[in-house]
């Protein structure tokens, strides 16, 4: 089991409501979000500014803060490009979306924790996350942690996409590198990442 610690321009369907866990406060759930097929491809995405130009991965002289492949076969990487500077990259053989800047946050949970890094593209936010939450609270039994990495996409506060890493070589968010390259926020950027738990059990 891969432990924490050491986004996929996507608009995929999202899971519906399920029981809350300690990862966040109780809140009402809406109907499952299903994005149109056309939304799965980038539209008017910013031109890549990556120093690599033709690959999504981090260069040897960059800090690999996060990296994984999603079910579509495309990759997400967050690479530290300089002091207090980093990029979010998504694409297949070449970058389709590159975003700079970002902020990060982390919280501890009983039996785990979560880190998030957020990048903005207009009103759309890409929140990369690495989380581990306890799913079994029976005395004397294993915690049965749910471990997930991925990206959740929000338009304002509306969830419009969620996709999980599908890669044995996933590099979860590195807390030390995130601290070195991003300003820290006091709270997580979204509690909706608990949707991932229902897809990994």
Stretches found by the model and what they are:
Residues 70-78, 120-140:
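Charged, amphipathic alpha-helical segments
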Residues 1-12:
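Sec-dependent bacterial lipoprotein signal peptides
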Residues 73, 112-114, 146-148:
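Short, surface-exposed coil-to-beta transition loops
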Residues 19-47:
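Low-complexity, Pro/Thr/Ser/Glu-rich flexible segments characteristic
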Residues 14-18:
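Bacterial signal peptide processing site
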Residues 37-106, 116:
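N-terminal secretory signal peptides
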Residues 156-201:
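C-terminal partner/receptor-binding element of secreted or periplasmic proteins
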Residues 83-92, 144-155:
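Short polybasic amphipathic segments
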């Amino acid at each position: 089991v891969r432990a924490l610690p050491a986004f996929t321009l996507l608009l995929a369907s999202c899971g519906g409501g399920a029981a809350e866990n300690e990862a966040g406060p109780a809140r009402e759930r809406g109907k499952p979000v299903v994005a149109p097929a056309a939304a799965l491809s980038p539209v008017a995405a910013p031109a890549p500014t990556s120093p690599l130009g033709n690959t999504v991965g981090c260069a040897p002289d960059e800090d690999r803060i996060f990296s994984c492949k999603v079910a579509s076969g495309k990759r997400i990487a967050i690479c530290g490009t300089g002091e207090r500077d980093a990029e979010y990259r998504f694409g297949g053989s070449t970058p389709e979306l590159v975003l700079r800047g970002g902020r990060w946050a982390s919280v501890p949970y009983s039996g785990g924790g979560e880190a998030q890094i957020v990048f903005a593209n207009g009103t759309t936010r890409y929140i990369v996350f690495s989380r581990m939450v306890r799913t079994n609270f029976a005395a004397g039994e294993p915690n049965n942690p749910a471990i997930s990495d991925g990206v959740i996409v929000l338009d304002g506060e509306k969830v419009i996409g969620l996709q999980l890493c599908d890669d044995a070589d996933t590099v979860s968010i590195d807390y030390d590198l995130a601290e070195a390259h991003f300003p820290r926020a006091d709270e997580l950027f979204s509690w909706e990442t608990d949707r991932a738990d229902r897809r990994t059990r």
